Amino acid sequence: MKLLIAGGGTGGHLFPGIAVAEEFLARNHSNEVLFVGTERGIEARLLPRLGYRLECITASGIKGQSPLAKIRSAAQLLYGYAQSRRILKEFRPDLVLGVGGYASAPVVLAARGMQIRRFIHEQNAIPGLTNKLLARFAEKVFISIEESRKFFPEDATILTGNPLRKEILWNVPLGQKTPASDEKLKLLVFGGSAGAHRINTAMIESLPFLAGVKERLIITHQTGEKDQAEVRKTYEQSGFAAEVTPFIDDMAAAYSNADMIVCRAGATTIAEVTACGKACIFIPYPYAADDHQRRNAEALLKKEAGYMILERELSGESLAFQVMELIAHPGKIEQTGRNARSLAQLDAAQVIVDEMTREQACTEK
């Protein structure tokens, strides 16, 4: 059986697709997977390194652009549609899964025209424009968060969770324990592959407020390239035990080692930290489409499965206050992690592959 996975652009779209690909290939050694994305997306750098086949098409967004740019994007969409039809004819997939991102639309639309079974996966609480449009053409819509159900056809929508890569699943800890009162606490701070300048700034501004507990903290801080030197210098001058790195290659190990986490609230990040059962302070990226990161974090706050500081309220003092609150009440670290873990859906990739192959089996009867 052949599966084509369309979309990407960011890790939030791509990583769930990789997780589904891993599960699909594990089912049968004769199964094949082809990814379709764009040359500008993270997929162009990552997928060849992971050994996956990738075809690139021309595609770009329309929302929020000038009238002239919209005309150009519409022309690219038509060209991308033609490219998608060629790829579909050559690869002849049994199933097409759109995971969001610019490349998803022309491929799923082309698959509809060629009567190939097509599905979409939505990672966020507030769906992107692409998936809202494609939902009407999909056999099934897989959602990660219950809050997004209202945007899609009820009879075609299935809550699966956000698929996780095997490297994350294999390192999921058995549980979060309450740290002892004299135990050192490991704080992980990260802001995505390029880092997050605002989080970096707030963290170093928090150090004077955290001075009284610095002997209890061991910090791992992923900054991105730009801020690394300045952040490392500030930790050293302030006397904090900190590992400062531009990138974290092994996120599974980083999650496993952490007691507390400060991070953004992208869908993949939330899926990973809930699977690992970690107490997180979420700082949603305020410019994400439709403010979906805030809504992602709020879904956890409702279940007492995390904490949130909006970026407009973020300061060194506010961040330090939240960290100090967890240090002062270590039982909250365990309970918040347990609540987060209860929301994790570790079998998301399995459920998605099950549903797609079931639809295909119905077609063949």
Curated annotation (Swiss-Prot):
Reaction(s) catalysed (UniProt annotation): di-trans,octa-cis-undecaprenyl diphospho-N-acetyl-alpha-D-muramoyl-L-alanyl-D-glutamyl-meso-2,6-diaminopimeloyl-D-alanyl-D-alanine + UDP-N-acetyl-alpha-D-glucosamine = di-trans,octa-cis-undecaprenyl diphospho-[N-acetyl-alpha-D-glucosaminyl-(1->4)]-N-acetyl-alpha-D-muramoyl-L-alanyl-D-glutamyl-meso-2,6-diaminopimeloyl-D-alanyl-D-alanine + UDP + H(+)
Residues the entry annotates as binding UDP-N-acetyl-alpha-D-glucosamine: T10, G11, G12, N124, R165, S193, I248, Q293
Cited InterPro entries: GlcNAc_MurG (IPR006009), Glyco_trans_28_C (IPR007235), GlycoTrans_28_N (IPR004276)
Membrane-topology descriptor: Peripheral membrane protein
Coiled-coil ranges (or none): none
SUPFAM superfamilies per the UniProt record, alphabetical: UDP-Glycosyltransferase/glycogen phosphorylase
Pathway: Cell wall biogenesis; peptidoglycan biosynthesis
One GO location term (cellular component): plasma membrane
Localisation per UniProt entry: Cell inner membrane
A Pfam family this chain is assigned to: Glyco_tran_28_C
Record-listed E.C. numbers: 2.4.1.227
GO molecular function: UDP-N-acetyl-D-glucosamine:N-acetylmuramoyl-L-alanyl-D-glutamyl-meso-2,6-diaminopimelyl-D-alanyl-D-alanine-diphosphoundecaprenol 4-beta-N-acetylglucosaminlytransferase activity; undecaprenyldiphospho-muramoylpentapeptide beta-N-acetylglucosaminyltransferase activity
GO biological process: carbohydrate metabolic process; cell division; cell wall organization; lipid glycosylation; peptidoglycan biosynthetic process; regulation of cell shape
Entry keyword set: Cell cycle, Cell division, Cell inner membrane, Cell membrane, Cell shape, Cell wall biogenesis/degradation, Glycosyltransferase, Membrane, Peptidoglycan synthesis, Transferase
Family to which this protein belongs: Belongs to the glycosyltransferase 28 family. MurG subfamily.
Function according to Swiss-Prot or TrEMBL: Cell wall formation. Catalyzes the transfer of a GlcNAc subunit on undecaprenyl-pyrophosphoryl-MurNAc-pentapeptide (lipid intermediate I) to form undecaprenyl-pyrophosphoryl-MurNAc-(pentapeptide)GlcNAc (lipid intermediate II).
PANTHER family in UniProt: GLYCOSYLTRANSFERASE (PTHR21015:SF22), UDP-N-ACETYLGLUCOSAMINE--N-ACETYLMURAMYL-(PENTAPEPTIDE) PYROPHOSPHORYL-UNDECAPRENOL N-ACETYLGLUCOSAMINE TRANSFERASE 1 (PTHR21015)
NCBIfam families associated with the record: murG
Name by which UniProt lists this protein: UDP-N-acetylglucosamine--N-acetylmuramyl-(pentapeptide) pyrophosphoryl-undecaprenol N-acetylglucosamine transferase
Source species of the chain: Geotalea uraniireducens (strain Rf4) (Geobacter uraniireducens)
